[in-house]
Amino acid sequence: MNNEQRGVALLIVLMLLALMAALAADMTLSFHSQLQRTRQVNHHLQRQYDIELAEKLALASLTQDVKDNDRQTTLQQYWAQPQQLQLEDGNTVKWQLRDAQHCFNLNALAKISDDPLASPDFPAQVFSALLINAGIDRGNTDEIVQSIADYIDVDDSPRFHGAEDSFYQSQTPPRHSANQMLFLTGELRQIKGITENIYQRLIPYVCVLPTTELSINLNMLTENDIPLFRALFLNNITDADARVLLQKRPREGWLTTDAFLYWAQQDFSGVKPLVAQVKRHLFPYSRYFTLSTESISDEQSQGWQSHIFFNRKQQSAQIYRRTLQLY
């Protein structure tokens, strides 16, 4: 073999070595990528298991508390206390159940009358009063109430101050009214008359539940909820009046709505004309709850928010929606 042939052979060997090195590097990268994906899947499955465990424990405590006392839902009960559990794998899971009925359910506006000559339905009157208490100009209340009602009702006929598809299609970007119940309070931002300032003023007092009922738990209202509390009485009571009524609540909570309204009438004359209407929307117990769960590991945290309906007749709880929380 001459020098030229030896050179060619050496070049071929070097090319083969380079190819083998490239293949080895590619296989190593592929292996590391696959290993990383496997780890991520395992971490995700573990966090999902942690969260499901917390859900089961939270629902069990809620169910037991209702069995022990099915007439009241209060913050003194065990279900309302924050919980934490250290798992064998080193992860920590935390959870907190919260009542979801110390707020105005926006979906209650779906049923209000569209007759411009009729007196406003009580939920519409309550919401108008709440808007005023939240610092929103009285001149904007009709537009906001009717626009929300139009956005979630099933027809395409706008109310006098409301808006349907004909309005939303002219916006940028064009869009449609939902024609169904709201799923998130953030949907308010899409509705005619709701500015960011109005949204931020409203958000502490409103919620969305999968029902068109307006049902508020009188045992869950605090001084932070005074604007809503006053609105329930169409602002016939002052902030100071509302504070007095909240302070009269027994430590273990009101046992019945009648007991609360009896004392309210004794102290404040503005309550009496509204007793029959308020009684239909004020209760000493809750059926809707929100569970916030967080799974914490050395690498990262993941949280879920589970939305719960408790069937009091069957004394069973079910999760009807979950949303991911980022940390």
UniProtKB/Swiss-Prot annotation:
GO terms for biological process: protein secretion. It is found in: Cell inner membrane. It comes from the Bacteria. InterPro entries: GspK, GspK_central_sf, Pilin-like, T2SSK_SAM-like_1st, T2SSK_SAM-like_2nd. The chain crosses the membrane at residues 7-27. It holds the Pfam family T2SSK. Induction: Silenced by the DNA-binding protein H-NS under standard growth conditions. Keywords: Cell inner membrane, Cell membrane, Membrane, Protein transport, Transmembrane, Transmembrane helix, Transport. Residues 28-327 are periplasmic. Residues 1-7 form a propeptide. Cleaved by prepilin peptidase. GO terms for cellular component: plasma membrane. Its main location: membrane. Part of a cryptic operon that encodes proteins involved in type II secretion machinery in other organisms, but is not expressed in strain K12. Type II secretion is composed of four main components: the outer membrane complex, the inner membrane complex, the cytoplasmic secretion ATPase and the periplasm-spanning pseudopilus. Interacts with core component GspG. NCBIfam families: T2SS_GspK. Belongs to the GSP K family. Component of the type II secretion system required for the energy-dependent secretion of extracellular factors such as proteases and toxins from the periplasm. Plays a role in pseudopilus assembly and seems to control its length. Interacts with the pseudopilus tip complex that is critical for the recognition and binding of secretion substrates. This is Putative type II secretion system protein K. It comes from Escherichia coli (strain K12). The gene is gspK.
